[in-house]
């Protein structure tokens, strides 16, 4: 290795991605040790890191071109040793001259003083704070003022951050393109509207409240299904650069709040609405009219009470077929659809606002490549028959779709481009239906999770890439419920 040209060695090092392999290789020779150290751009440290100032300075000298640092103390207990504190963070910020991306996770000994050190890090572009219990709005404001290049900010489970002066400053003088706020109980969704002109630059935005799937349920609250939050320009801001929007676990009544964003996104490509309360058809209709570029939509819906007439009230999910018709008419680039329904009983199909007719209008109007249906009680074998003629469908995931049987499997087996199929808790599908998939010889990947009437032997006969499990926890853990 000593005789190889440095340029060739550098290329070899670039192709090695595992940190353990890089560490081993650096011990082979002094040349490799130096070159690997100079080339390493990212490190992830946590429990076991020596927090002495001298050791941290030595680490920074070993890797002089670090641009990405992740400090993660998840699972930390006192016997693991000391955590990095404000003084240690100052060493990183002052000795890593190329630092642009910093993540602090479960750092219990870093507070506002530590964040003030980052204010001198003029190259910082991305900052992620996860479970930072001692950081408040004061420290965040110092970062907003000092880090003039900051374009991405993630705040997750930061319970002491409340005042939004930092947000107002970033909206007025900052350059944020990505903002993610989750589980920060001091920040309400309507506070985010104080971002003002900053919405113009934002390309990705996520806000998730503190409630779980049922955390916002209020059985005595009835929402107006005819209310139109977009008929008047209540908030004077634009978000024409926004491409990725996620709203989860928030109640948009009586405060309209972030609901207003839905009618202002002209460049939106990806939308995720997960257990947002009080929305109705008018919200998706307004969005569809301005978002002709929409390519992916995820709607996770639970039961709510709606009424447009004081004499009548119904319990159902937020949207009806009118929303599907609007999407079908205006969003002709839609490729990914994820529909999940929570708390809806199979013997009460009216609890879901969508019908199979409306759903198929959407599917047949757009080039859908990926389709996920969870507890879609309106969907049956006739729906599978219609789906089988979808010319672009490549990936299909069905979970707890009780009306889908072996007949549906026979239909879907002949879908022109279908290469990946996932069945979870679909108890009306048996070995007979799975055999139909094997006869078609089209699938490249098959996942069977907790389908009680499907055997491992039948699944293995379909294709080479098969995942099979009878463990019910596997079925739930792999469908994203951890994000609820």
Sequence positions of predicted segments:
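Eukaryotic tandem repeat interaction scaffolds
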Residues: 212, 273-276, 289-428
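C-terminal interaction modules of eukaryotic adaptor/scaffold proteins
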Residues: 416, 421-428, 432-484
């Amino acid at each position: 290795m000593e005789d190889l040209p440095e340029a060739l060695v550098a290329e070899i090092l670039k192709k090695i991605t595992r940190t353990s392999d890089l560490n081993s290789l650096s011990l082979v020779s002094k040349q490799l040790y130096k070159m690997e150290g100079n080339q390493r751009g990212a490190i992830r440290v946590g429990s076991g890191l020596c927090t002495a100032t001298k050791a941290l300075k030595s680490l920074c000298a070993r890797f002089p071109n670090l641009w990405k640092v992740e400090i993660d103390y998840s699972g930390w207990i006192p016997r693991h040793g000391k955590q990095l504190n404000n003084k240690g963070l100052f060493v990183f910020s002052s000795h890593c001259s190329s630092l642009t991306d910093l993540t602090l996770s479960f750092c219990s000994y870093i507070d506002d003083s530590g964040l003030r050190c980052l204010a001198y890090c003029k190259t910082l572009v991305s900052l992620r704070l996860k479970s930072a219990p001692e950081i408040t709005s004061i420290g965040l404001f110092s970062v907003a003022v000092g880090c003039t290049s900051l374009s991405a900010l993630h705040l997750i489970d930061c319970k002491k951050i409340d005042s939004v002066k930092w947000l107002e400053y970033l909206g007025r003088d900052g350059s944020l393109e990505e903002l993610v706020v989750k589980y920060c109980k001091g920040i309400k969704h309507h506070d985010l509207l104080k971002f003002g002109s900053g919405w113009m630059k934002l390309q990705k935005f996520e806000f998730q409240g503190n409630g779980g799937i049922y955390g916002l349920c209020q059985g005595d609250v009835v929402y107006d299904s005819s209310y139109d939050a977009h008929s008047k320009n209540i908030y004077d801001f634009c978000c024409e650069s926004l491409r990725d929007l996620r709203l989860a676990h928030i109640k948009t009544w009586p405060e309209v709040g972030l609901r207003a964003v839905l009618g202002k996104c002209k460049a939106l490509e990806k939308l995720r609405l997960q257990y947002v309360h009080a929305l109705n058809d008018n919200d998706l209709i307004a969005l569809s009219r301005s978002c002709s570029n929409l390519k992916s939509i995820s709607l996770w819906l639970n039961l709510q009470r709606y009424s447009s007439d004081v004499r009548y009230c119904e319990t159902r999910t937020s949207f009806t077929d009118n929303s599907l018709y609007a999407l079908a008419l205006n969003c002709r680039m839609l490729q990914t659809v994820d529909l999940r329904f929570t708390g809806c009983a199979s013997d009460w199909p009216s609890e879901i606002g969508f019908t199979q007719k409306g759903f198929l209008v959407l599917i047949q109007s757009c080039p859908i490549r990926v389709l996920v249906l969870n507890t879609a009680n309106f969907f049956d074998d006739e729906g599978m028959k219609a789906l089988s003629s979808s010319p672009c469908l490549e990936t299909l995931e069905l979970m707890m779709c009780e009306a889908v049987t072996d007949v549906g499997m026979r239909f879907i087996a002949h879908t022109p481009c279908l290469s990946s199929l996932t069945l979870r808790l679909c108890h009306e599908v048996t070995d007979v239906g799975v055999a139909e998939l094997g006869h078609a010889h089209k699938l490249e990947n098959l996942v069977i999770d907790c389908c009680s009437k499907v055997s491992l032997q039948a699944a293995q006969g379909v294709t080479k890439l098969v995942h099979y499990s009878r463990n019910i926890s596997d079925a739930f853990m792999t469908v994203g419920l951890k994000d609820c």
